[in-house]
């Protein structure tokens, strides 16, 4: 200690009180210190009561506030502007001529900004803001309660919930609990923390503990956390249900008015509970005066506060857990840390003490697990609600903390002074460079090099005529322009205008007349072709031009050299600053990024997930509730740095890179092999997990039995239908009906195809003297194949697709095997419908005989069937697309969406096999996206109406048609338009959070938003594909041509 103990106590008390006052000032917007101190005194230091007291007091005078607002908004009302509660004391005249008032206003503004900037790294502030936010939500949603099934419904098929091999296990969202999943998964993947929890044993005297210990629910929570961790280790399920642990947390987190706390406070509370639970165990197992607590050893460190308070020096050692950092105003993590470690002047509550105050923080002991809270929320006093800060903040995978250690403080101070000196010099250089890059004295400025170049170009230009104005006047009016004598005079124009307009004031008539005579040269005439495009000097001698060019060239070269030198100097300084801490002595304390907790949304609502580094596989994993997927550093950066969309990191968890015990696996003492899965569990948890796995195995067996029984029933039903269909087909053929529906038919032998086949056979028989059926068949097949090849190679407009006309065209374009095409053509000429034509009967018999002679080894029947199945799917996809686009044009967006979704999915599957297997993917994607946007707009308008029936209809549209299909747009990250469309839809609904609405509407919105913001890529089950009507090839081609023609007539911005 460098001062007496009472000075330190006074410092701590004043700092604590000042912190509370700063929090109240920011939350409530009240700047009067006396009012704030009185509120804090009346509430006995309770921040929540103080906020409630102040907000209730302000709420009593809404009319006065409204009046004040309009007085400041209307320029003609008053010359004075009232600012918060200082309207009577700090009135500044900004409309008069007194420059002192203006300077005073600027000074006050800067002082307020600097004060807010200095108040960084205060966890209580975060919590207070969160409480105000939650109070607002609680008032609107009226203590909303939700059942787990409203958020997520388990698939009836247990195989959808089965864990794949040793894949990481997810956590089920049981009602806005994505925050729980993100935090717990981050801690679970710290192997040392996992071991501590799994091997925890409650104190033997747990029943004898004081009643308040049980009220805290530490031991029940530890029991449920052990069970949860055990399931995460050894379950056979894809995800597990954390409901029991969550319920204990929710009960403990509810205050008297049922407000639920924020995620940061949840993490604090979680570690506090764990610390208490392990403290009880530690005290039982040791007789030491201060037993070691493994939670404290793992997550808590110490720093030394060194500073000056009212002119007196002090040093004080403090313990810290999660380290809070402000984001606003900083570009990377080191800048945040620098600002948090160096505090500026501390405001004194006693005005008579004028000594300067300030302090530095130096880490003396860092925890193995170092967690940074990134404060991305601030209270907007103008709007009266918290707002999220979306600014970009970069952070490294390896963070070196040597510069913040107490043992390095002398060298760090030297380096900080050097960096400050370099930054000051950098500012001077940048200002010099700016003078070169933005040259001029007017509002428009240009690079000086360009100015000199333009001057050189002007001087070198050659004049064509003496006066461009005279030249234009002298030239005759070009074709299409109006001769001057035909234009009405100014008086005539004014008279015409006056006669057409209603009676107006003289000033408005004068304004109209002044505007009516404005000459518009670029719309009233065209420039003669011989007029020079650039101006040029009228008179300049060769000597003058030579001197001027020489000077301009020389000056331009000088400026280019100066600019280059400045840019190189600036780059060198930047590089020097970046490498300031890169020497070996300052990279001895490496911390590696272990987990990043991400929040997407606004201050009032959003979704949480986590990126966690898999140290065994050396890759990043994304934990998003039940979905656990492989990820990458690039994806993490895109979602976590901020500045893009609404997602950004709110918590960073670093681990000591030299503390390998944190991530080291356990090994079998006998075999030396690493223990995996259920082997790592204590006996009691092993029995618990095995019992749960047996229940799940039984569920799988019951499902298999149900499927087997269902398959048997379907098989019996199918055989019965087959017998009935064979009877009906025989009856239809006997009736001589040549045209039938082609959906189930592989040969697609419709009326128009039958006529084309007959024409080909007739043509082939006329070309050969040998009229034998086999000769005619061979000739006909050659002619038909040549015709189809020509169609396949023809360049057609979008409305004509010959693949729809004939299956062989589809095969040719997709390079099907020759044997597949030959057999398909034989089936065309061997179709039984040709038996009704005397000219083709014998040809059909020969074709059928050839088909029967084809051996299985000559044509792969499975491949043959697969090609025809793909063609059937192509026709179905076409029909889905046609109906979807027709409904879209009729503005029947729900029906359109269902068909377009099926079209897109089928088409994507086809295109994966070949470029010409399906339709234009971008076209289908565009209308699918537009359909979702239109439906979202309709639903939002229904919600805005406020009518219960309309609101419910709007939410039904969102829940039934928008939310289930959003993952389809997010699957392909390369489709930027789809991702932006999803962001637009989400932002539309998030924008309602800042609006006043009825409590029941706020409740519905709060219930619905987590589903909309769920970032899970897992595609949940949705509506069955709509049934297609029966259609002929002719109808299919005709409707396709009609809809594509209508699209081609749609303007580009409408497609």
From Swiss-Prot:
The active site is at residues 178, 599, 607. It comes from the Eukaryota. The keyword Protease applies. One of its GO terms (biological process) is protein K63-linked deubiquitination. The modification Phosphotyrosine is found at residue 740. Residues 541-578, 684-717 form a coiled coil. Residues 476-496 have a biased composition (Polar residues). It is found in: Cytoplasm. Acetylated. Sumoylation impairs binding to and hydrolysis of ubiquitin chains. Sumoylated preferentially with SUMO2 or SUMO3. Desumoylated by SENP1. Polyubiquitinated by SMURF1 by promoting the 'Lys-48'-linkage leading to proteasomal degradation. InterPro entries: Papain-like_cys_pep_sf, Peptidase_C19, Peptidase_C19_UCH, UBA-like_sf, UBA_8, UIM_dom, USP25/28_UIM, USP_CS. Changing residue 916 to H: In EIG19; uncertain significance. Gene3D superfamilies: 6.10.250.1720, Cysteine proteinases, DNA helicase RuvA subunit, C-terminal domain. Changing residue 156 to Q: In EIG19; uncertain significance. Residues 97-116, 123-140 form the UIM domain. Isoform USP25a is found in most adult and fetal tissues; expression is moderately high in testis, pancreas, kidney, skeletal muscle, liver, lung, placenta, heart, but very low in peripheral blood, colon, small intestine, ovary, prostate, thymus and spleen. Expressed in the brain, with high levels in the cerebral cortex. Isoform USP25b is found in all tissues except heart and skeletal muscle. Isoform USP25m is heart and skeletal muscle specific. It is an enzyme of class 3 (hydrolase). Residues 464-507, 727-749 are annotated as: Disordered. It catalyses: Thiol-dependent hydrolysis of ester, thioester, amide, peptide and isopeptide bonds formed by the C-terminal Gly of ubiquitin (a 76-residue protein attached to proteins as an intracellular targeting signal). There is a cross-link at residue 99 (Glycyl lysine isopeptide (Lys-Gly) (interchain with G-Cter in SUMO)). It is linked to Epilepsy, idiopathic generalized 19: An autosomal dominant form of idiopathic generalized epilepsy, a disorder characterized by recurring generalized seizures in the absence of detectable brain lesions and/or metabolic abnormalities. Generalized seizures arise diffusely and simultaneously from both hemispheres of the brain. Seizure types include juvenile myoclonic seizures, absence seizures, and generalized tonic-clonic seizures. EIG19 is characterized by onset of variable types of seizures in the first two decades of life. Homotetramer, inhibited form. Homodimer, active form. Interacts with ACTA1 (via its C-terminus); the interaction occurs for all isoforms but is strongest for isoform USP25m in muscle differentiating cells. Interacts (isoform USP25m only) with MYBPC1; the interaction prevents proteasomal degradation of MYBPC1. Interacts (isoform USP25m only) with FLNC (via filament repeats 17-18, 20-21 and 24). Interacts with GAPDH. Interacts with SUMO3; the interaction sumoylates efficiently USP25. Interacts with SUMO2; the interaction sumoylates efficiently USP25. This is Ubiquitin carboxyl-terminal hydrolase 25. It comes from Homo sapiens (Human).
